[in-house]
Amino acid sequence: MDRFTPFFLLVILFSSNLLVRADGDEEDEGDKKKSEVGTVIGIDLGTTYSCVGVFKNGRVDIIANDQGNRITPSYVAFTADGERLIGDAAKNQLTSNPENTIFDVKRLIGRTFDDKSVQHDIKFYPFKVTNANNKPHIQAATGEGDRSFAPEEISAMVLSKMRDIAEEYLGKKITNAVVTVPAYFNDAQRQATKDAGTIAGLNVMRIINEPTAAAIAYGLDKKEGEKNILVFDLGGGTFDVSLLTIDNGVFEVVSTNGDTHLGGEDFDQRVMEHFIKLYKKKKGKDIRKDNRAVQKLRREVEKAKRALSSAHQVRLEIESFFDGEDFSESLTRAKFEELNMDLFRSTMKPVKQVLEDADLKTDDIDEIVLVGGSTRIPKVQQLVKEYFNGKEPSRGINPDEAVAYGAAVQAGVLSGEEDTGDLVLLDVNPLTMGIETVGGVMTKLIPRNTVIPTKKSQIFSTAADNQPTVTIQVYEGERSMTKDNHLLGKFDLTGIPPAPRGVPQIEVTFEIDVNGILKVTAEDKGTGSKNQIVIQNDQNRLSPEDIERMINDAEKYADEDKKVKEKVDAKNELESYAYSLKNQIGDKEKLGAKLSDEDKEKITEAVDEAIKWLESNAEAESEAFNEKKTELEGIVQPIMTKLYEQSGGAPPPSGEEESEEAEKDEL
């Protein structure tokens, strides 16, 4: 093989390690006033659950959704009658509508269709995943017929739901957010997450790493001097380990490692496979053919897993499970651990790696912070404790809310909130980035665990005489040959004047912004000719046109959701008003005793007619329900006015007292 000097030509592309393209992020980071930015929210966009928080009045509020829950399922569903459901409502109808209930999109976003993990996962999804230019798309039957959705579109719907939850609580419109991603997400996954925010109508001011956000939640009020913190973040679908030093508000990530395809969903799947095999052995029937049965099992297995964090044995009971037969089996904690022990043990490898990368020993770690719902599993806690020679992990933060908490603090800093302290956040890129040089060699420009933002340049040259063009191929990964690493993209630098090999000087610059998004530039120092890439040309990226179309689709869905809600509200108002009148007329001690027989009959006829109309026009539009209520009020109101005048009181405003009465009656 030819010897090569630091000069030979190569190809560089955009790098895959940090994904959000944030032009001018450093300004965002600056002292923007609240008047410019407004309130910024922090969103933990999780595989299985999402959470939103806001920093105000000197503290973080984690915001509950309309069901009173502080975490919201990352589920989207399309019902047979054309309604779109997001969150709890979507997850609650999974077993009755499995093919059109979409979840786990965080495991698809930013990945190619032929990715091994995607091919593994789609075997277990009840919904259909198709190949669109080697990008996974999800098929669903919507009110407008069958639709194909990019993972970014589904994530955008979840982000919109989290924004709606915040807007309802804050009573104002929100346009800016900090969104978290796994530390081990690559550039494509980060950029796709940023795109999802754009589709949702959110300006994602910053993408921050989940374990870093959790460290902020843990250490914001810690003032005891420098400490080494290890964050062990095992969630529903991803796993990260980050080692940080915290020193009076300065959070510096020293090293990070993880697995973007390991979490509670995998533990559930192992248990499901166990019960599917057991059922086949006992009954001779394969339930995999029935999506509803599989999703019923999924629901019960998740419940059982949670219960086994405190109990040692649980029983799973499912009525009419398959072919009309019930399901009843027990699961012990020991069996659950046996089914997943290799996965549990695999979490120790990244722990070992971050310590090695930081050149620290287990005894150098001052605090272990457990984050993510899966860290409630006793065996996981035991393995972590044993690895650190019996050291107890910190119990000070809520593992479900810590990431959103940290994101909300960062959001508070960006929006100029007071009392966020002198917070300084120094994060790192998780994977080495470089370009391919002669012979398929990976020439590294930015090593993993380099503090970001960062910029690094190196001079390369041509590999052949009179070579007019060089191709810059950008890779991420730790292997010495590019074939073993991940290609992020490539671009050409053309117009190089004829010259012997090794003479032209081509400067390649890698620049990673605060979001971990990579920009690669190549410049011919002789001519000043320049080209660059920010991953836009990668086939896995959405084009600006795609994003614009998806924004319009998202707005259309929001309008449709609003119309559905208006219809439901109008129907409920009419129904509530009619039944309230019916109940009051039937009450012989109240209104029923005060009305003349003639007036009573008049109202009764009108109410019965309205109820009958409701039964036969359940799918009417909101205007029709409102008109019917106005019509009913037109009959009732003069009678009520006459009644009040006879008793010497003022008449109630049009129908309001009765409808308020109705609401009180129904409490």
UniProtKB/Swiss-Prot annotation:
Q: Indicate yes or no for the key word ATP-binding.
A: yes
Per the UniProt entry, the Enzyme Commission number(s) are: 3.6.4.10
Annotated region (Substrate-binding (SBD)) at 409-509
Q: Which InterPro entries match?
A: ATPase_NBD, BIP_NBD, Heat_shock_70_CS, HSP70_C_sf, HSP70_peptide-bd_sf, Hsp_70_fam
Lineage start = Eukaryota, Metazoa, Spiralia, Lophotrochozoa, Mollusca
Q: Tell me the superkingdom of the source.
A: Eukaryota
User: Under what name is this protein listed?
Assistant: Endoplasmic reticulum chaperone BiP
* UniProt note on regulation of activity: The chaperone activity is regulated by ATP-induced allosteric coupling of the nucleotide-binding (NBD) and substrate-binding (SBD) domains. In the ADP-bound and nucleotide-free (apo) states, the two domains have little interaction. In contrast, in the ATP-bound state the two domains are tightly coupled, which results in drastically accelerated kinetics in both binding and release of polypeptide substrates. J domain-containing co-chaperones stimulate the ATPase activity and are required for efficient substrate recognition.
